[in-house]
Each structure stands twice: as C-alpha cells, then as structure tokens.
C-alpha cells in the first residue's frame, strides 16, 4: 500500500505531492486490473486523504473500473455520490463505468436511472453507456426496454455498433424472443454492421429457446456460408434446439459434423445429443454417445448421467438405468433427485415396485438426496403397476408427510389408480373426496380412475354421480370416463341409462371406441334389443372401428335370446376373425346380405 514517508511535515512539496498522486493512481489502476475493488476504495477514501491528497477524476474513474470488473454495482453508485459531494462532477466515463457495473448484475433500474441523470449533468449518454444499459436490461429480463434503448440511440445521435446489437440480441435470447432476434440480425447487415460469432450464437440460442429448430440450423448454416466462424457454442445451441423438438437425427448429424468443421465437441455437445436421443427413447444411441465422452477425453457429469438414465427409462431398460445410477459414486459424480427420479421411473415402467421403494426410502437417504414429488409419484405409480395398493396408500398418506412433501394431482391420481386396480373403490372415492380439502384440484384422470373403480365394483350410481361431479367441477369428461360409466350401467342391468349415456357421447363430440360400442351392445343384449345391437355393430366399420370377439359374442347372444336363428346364422356366416387372438378384430364378408338387409329395419338405440 502507498504510505507517507517518515519525518514528513504537515505539508508536502509540490513535486512530492505529484509523485504521491501518481503512485496512488498507479496502485488504484493495478487494483482495478485485478478487480480488487475493496483495496482500491480503501486507497481512494483512506490513504489518499491521509497523504493530504484530494482524489481526482482519474483516481475515481479507476476505482469505479475496479468495481465494474468485480461486478460491484452498489459501491460504484456510492462512489458517484461521493464525487458529487466533493463537487467533483462525474464525467461520461464515470457514468459509463457505473452503468457497466450495474449491467453485470442485471440492475436495470439503477442503470436506467444513471443514464437518465446524465443530461442533468450536461452529459450526453454515449455508445458505451447505452450499450451497457442495454446489457443491464437484458440481464434483468427486460428485453422490451433493451430493444427500445437500441431503437432510441439514433435520436441521441449515437450510432449502434456491433456491441449494442449483440447486447440487444442477447436480451432477446434470454426472453426466448426468436423473431425480433432474427430481425435484428438482418438489420445489422442492412446497417453495414457485420454480425460476429456472438451475434449469431445469441440468435441461434433464441431460436432454440423458442423451439424453432429449423431456424437455428439455418442461422448456423448462414454462419458457415458467410465465414463467420461458428464455434462449439454455435453447434451446441443448434443441437439443443433440435433435441428440444425431438429432431434427434439432426442433433446426431450436427455433432458428427463438428470435427469436419475443425471444432472439437465438448461435454455440452455430447450432453445435448444424449438428451436429444433420450427424448425419443433412442437409448442405444444415448449409450453410444455417453461412451464416446471418455474416448474424447471428456468426463461425464451429472447432466450426462441424468440424460442416459432417462434414456434407459424411456427405452424400458431399467437394469441399465440402475447400472448407471450405481456408477455415479465411483465416477465421483453426485446423483441428484433428477437421477433418482429417472431410475425410479424406469423401475415403475417395469412394475419393479420393490426396487422403486428401495431407491426412494433407502438409497436416496443414504446418499443424502432429498426425495421430491417426482420420485415419490414414480414410486406410487410403480406400486400401482405392481398391484400394491396398500403400499401406494402408505407412500401417499404416511411417507410423503414424513418427508415433508406435499402430494400433488399426479400423486393422488397414481394412488387412486392403484386402488382401482386393487378393487378398492371405497379408498378411491375417499381419496378423490379429500383432494379439494388438501388444495389439490381433481383432474379428468382423477375422476376417470375413480369412476372405473366404481364400475369394477358394480356401483353404477356412484359412477354416475362422479360423472355429474366431473361436469360440475368443469373437468371435461373423456371417452374413458364415459366408457366406465356406460359399462357400469350395462353390467348392473341399467341398459336404458347405458344406451342414453352412449348417445350423449355424440352430443359432447366424444368419439366412441370399441370399448364404448361393446358396452352399448352389451346393454342391448341384456335388454334383448337385437335390432339396436345389429345397428351398433354395423355402425362400427363406418367409424373405422372393427368389431372384436366381444362385440360379435354380445350381438350373437342378443339374436339367440330373441330367437333370431336365421339372422344369427347369416350374421355368423358373414363374419371372420382377423388374427388368432380371441381379442382380435372381426370383419364381414360380402356374403352377409341378410345382416345388411336386417340393418334397414334396425333403429338407433334409445
């Protein structure tokens, strides 16, 4: 630090004063280059006054530069106030440096205020100051203000340059505003401002965030055509854009083209490609590129492992998913809740509920990873698929509260489905009824699973009641909901209700499927309405639906009950199965003329 020499008097000779001032300036400038802002401020505020030196503009601006380099916007603003208090008017450099300090921290309000103060100090905002303010707005998520500042620069007689445009395009990229970003990129060329790699990269990333993979790739190709030298960031953004839109083939092509462009793929390149393959369940390719990381001298990180585990999960490769999860500690990679959630989900898809529970309740806690909604929901769903309704309820009602995890709609839906599959309609009804009290809004899936549970237990009144509640809750019933209620009424002998609900589906613009028709045909069979059964079964091919073994069996029974033996013989003679399974579809041969003739006398079920 700069100190006064021993034996000095109360006043310094003019040349000594100049020497000390030069030394102080040099020291502050050195601190500024190293971003040592505290040392610079201490020298400015303490040591210079102790040497009876009044800090001048150069010393203040150097100290402001130290704050800017360290991203310390608050001390920078305080220094400006100090200058005003000393009647030392800040100049354009002072303001520009302070605004730049704000830009790095996204303090756009303070940056705008400082720019607004400049005219009151008879200072005109310059290119550096305005570009820094644009950058501050971008960092603060204020892309509209950034664009306004850029467009307002000519009014202040300031011509935007490459830095100004890049700051604005970067602001648009952070806001996923791909259209204005493309527009500014074109405008740069029109204004004879040559876009650089930063301009193109920000535009590619903006398109990627806006899921515009074609435009991302187009901009990348434009870079190559104009010799703008794309780098790994350019390719990584384009690969990510393709991956987000499930264009995994193009992601792979871009990765493999990087060496030809003399660009070495980095870990981000590989991770983005693995993620692209993961989204489409291309687990073999994901494994290939994961294995390519060490061959390229790169170490897989948490993102790499999470992507490959998720790829295995989507590809039904639960053993591989668990293998990669177990490898993470040896690779010195910390598994996260994402890693475990993907592995648990892999076990869930394979109905390996014991493994799912072991991961959730044992291994996660042993590795110090806190379970979350995703991991708990996957475990509940694993229990549902494994027929373990008691364990599903235990996770929802006991373990999640202990873990301080609030169940959401997916948690309840999985538990209700578990109860439905376990013929536990009472629990399904209770869970659905409890959801609003816990601040969870039942969805169409919640209602459908509960209605299905009631249908399986023969509680047609409850099924019908929940269908009504569903409408009251403004949850749109689906074909699944209606199928369950129609089937419930049909099985309980409520054939009029079953047929009435079936007809309502058309009014609600719901498309009946094979299940809907089979339930309606079953209602006709129970009520001996053979004409209606025939009309329904002949209607199915018109909707691109083929009757299956159940449809034919129910219609045949309806004919038998009504003593329609000639019709039955003709009907069966005109049908043949497609395939060998009893659930296979059936179709009619041209010889079924009697069945078609009888259809003319059949009526719409009522």
Per-region residue spans from a language model:
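Acidic, glycine-centered low-complexity repeats within long intrinsically disordered regions
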Residues: 35, 50-52, 122, 155, ...
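Inter-helix linker motif
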Residues: 16, 51-52, 87, 122, ...
């Amino acid at each position: 630090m700069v100190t006064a020499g021993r034996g000095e008097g109360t006043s310094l000779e003019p040349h000594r004063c100049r020497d000390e001032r030069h030394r102080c300036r040099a020291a502050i400038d050195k601190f500024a280059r190293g971003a040592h802002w505290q040392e610079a401020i201490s020298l400015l505020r303490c040591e210079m006054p102790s040497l009876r030196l009044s800090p001048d503009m150069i010393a203040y601006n150097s100290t402001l530069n130290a704050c800017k380099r360290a991203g310390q916007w608050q001390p920078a603003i305080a220094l400006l106030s100090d200058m005003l208090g000393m009647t030392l008017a800040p100049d354009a450099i002072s303001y520009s440096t302070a605004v730049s300090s704000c830009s790095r921290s996204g303090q756009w309000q303070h940056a705008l205020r400082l720019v607004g103060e400049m005219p009151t100090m008879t200072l005109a905002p310059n290119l550096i100051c305005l570009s820094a303010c644009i950058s501050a707005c971008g960092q603060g998520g204020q892309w509209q203000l950034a664009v306004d500042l850029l467009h307002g620069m000519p009014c202040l007689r300031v011509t935007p340059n490459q830095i100004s445009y890049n700051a604005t395009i970067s602001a648009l990229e952070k806001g996923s505003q791909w259209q204005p970003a493309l527009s500014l990129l074109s405008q740069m060329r029109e204004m004879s401002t040559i876009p650089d790699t930063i301009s193109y990269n920000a535009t590619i990333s903006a398109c990627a965030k806006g899921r515009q993979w074609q435009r991302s790739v187009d901009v990348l190709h434009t870079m190559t055509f104009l010799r703008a030298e794309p780098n790994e960031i350019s390719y990584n953004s384009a690969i990510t854009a393709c991956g987000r839109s499930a264009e995994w083939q193009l992601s792979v092509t871009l990765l493999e083209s990087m060496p030809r462009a003399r660009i070495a793929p980095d870990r981000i390149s590989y991770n983005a490609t693995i993620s692209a393959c993961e989204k489409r369940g291309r687990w073999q390719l994901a494994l290939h590129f994961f294995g390519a990381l060490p061959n390229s001298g790169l170490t897989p990180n948490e993102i790499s492992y999470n992507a490959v585990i998720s790829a295995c999960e989507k590809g039904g490769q639960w053993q591989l998913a668990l293998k990669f999860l177990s490898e993470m500690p040896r690779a010195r990679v910390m598994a996260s809740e994402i890693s475990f959630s993907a592995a648990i989900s892999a076990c869930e898809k394979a109905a390996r509920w014991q493994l799912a529970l072991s991961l959730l309740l044992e291994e996660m806690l042993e590795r110090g990873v806190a379970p979350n909604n995703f991991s708990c929901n996957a475990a509940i769903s694993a229990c549902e698929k494994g027929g373990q309704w008691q364990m599903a309820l235990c996770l929802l009602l006991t373990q999640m509260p202990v873990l301080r995890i609030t169940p959401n709609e997916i948690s309840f839906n999985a538990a209700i489905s578990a109860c439905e599959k376990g013929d536990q309609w009472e629990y399904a009804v209770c869970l659905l009824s409890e959801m609003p009290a816990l601040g969870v809004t039942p969805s169409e899936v919640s209602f459908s699973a509960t209605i299905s549970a009631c249908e399986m237990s023969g509680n047609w009144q409850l099924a019908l009641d929940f269908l009504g509640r569903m409408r009251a809750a403004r949850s749109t019933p689906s074909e699944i909901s209606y199928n369950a209620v129609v089937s419930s009424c049909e099985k309980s002998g409520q054939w009029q209700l079953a047929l009435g609900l079936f007809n309502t589906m058309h009014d609600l613009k719901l498309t009946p499927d094979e299940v809907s028709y089979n339930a309606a045909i079953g209602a006709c069979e129970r009520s001996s309405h053979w004409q209606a059964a025939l009309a329904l079964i002949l209607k199915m091919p018109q909707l691109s639906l083929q009757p299956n073994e159940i449809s034919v069996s129910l219609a045949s029974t309806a004919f038998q009950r009504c003593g329609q033996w000639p019709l039955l013989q003709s009907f069966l003679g005109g049908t043949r199965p497609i395939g060998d399974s009893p659930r296979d579809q059936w179709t009619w041969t041209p010889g079924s003329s009697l069945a078609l003739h009888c259809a003319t006398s059949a009526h719409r079920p009522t």
